[in-house]
Amino acid sequence: MKAMASADWYFDFVSPFSYLQCEQLPQLERSIRVRYRPVLFAGLLKAYGHKGPAEIPAKRRFTYQFVAWQAKRIGVPFKFPPVHPFNPLPLLRLAVAADADPEVIRRIFRFVWRDGRLGDLPIEWAELMTEIDMPDAAARIESPEVKEALRRNTDEAIARGVFGVPTLAIGEALFWGADATAMVADYIAQGCRFADPEMARVADLPIGVEREADKRK
């Protein structure tokens, strides 16, 4: 019997698109083994010198409306938290402290993006800890081991070329964004490769012109 292929799923709770893909992963997990890898999206942005979508006003507005539209279109319950962006570090460390358990991660995502809460109020944090059955979470997320594991995940993602979240990495193939989920399903169905020769051709397409470096720097 052929072994099931595996993928690493890089995500950050600050990303609503990570939530949308998290809700769709169980369908993919029928045919591929997924390892959940929490990473700090801000660390990826810093590594590549990019701005996040929320740092460009017009893009921020469109992104928020687009993800709300997309959630409704695919039938995923969705509600923005009171503010965004927010500091995801406590939640990311919580996922690490829970050994990246998929069910815990899914519950955290739903707490933020289905229920529209952040856990930044003591009563909300207590409710989340009860929901995931981790009463000692406040101490665990401050452990050096947990903090280092999150840094290691982020460094690993950067080393693999991951530039955004969510990203599914299957070997050297990277699939970025919740709207790439169907593409991942096709890739798996084709034996973790793309049979279309045009897909192979564009993967190594020559660069015709490059933008000049900003001379003001």
For the regions a language model picked out, list residue spans one by one:
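Extreme N-terminal starter segment of soluble prokaryotic enzymes
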Residues: 2-8
